[in-house]
Amino acid sequence: MHLRPWNIDTDYDTLVKWWDQHDFGRVPKEVLPREGMVVEDENNNRICAGGLYMNINEHKFGFMEWVVADPKAKPKLAHKSIKLLIDSLIKLATDKGCVLLYTVTENPGLHKRYVKYHGLSQGENNARTFVKDLTNGKYGPMLWAKSQEVLDEEQDN
């Protein structure tokens, strides 16, 4: 198992495949961060990936996002790979000069993992996220930014 920087041009199709398999929705390529990591097995098969938004020239705040794993990966391999990925994203943020790292997820597995294995503190329990398409609809319904609960509520209204 090894780690490498992600390349949005060559890794994007894999991310889309995993997001589709997780029924997550597709994050537009142009909004993904330039910084990110991919964990691969010994045969260079991708296992998991995640991104890190940061602009150290303007602030020392990092935002870790889009952590996703191949849903077909064996659970033990996925667990070890995700640990390596998150530890590496935290190290990257530290090495680049970030002093605070923030992340948001609705995934209960990541909730536990962030606290137990990576030393993150839980911030909020019932926060809501909001997103606005500033292109007047180019990104459609933005399913990638909505939880199933929100999608169900929208369908009921």
Predicted regions and their residues:
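Short acidic DE-rich linear segments
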Residues: 155-157
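A conserved beta-strand-loop-helix scaffold within acyl/acetyltransferase catalytic domains
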Residues: 5-7, 13-42, 47-69
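Hydrophobic beta-strand residues in large extracellular and virion-surface proteins
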Residues: 3, 37-39, 101, 130
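Short secondary-structure junctions
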Residues: 3-4, 25-27, 119-125
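Short N-terminal secondary-structure initiator segments
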Residues: 1-19, 136-145
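Active-site/acyl-donor-binding loops of N-acyltransferases
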Residues: 103-151
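Acyl-donor binding region in acyl/amide transferases
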Residues: 62-118, 124-125
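Short loop segments at secondary-structure junctions
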Residues: 42-44, 72, 133-137
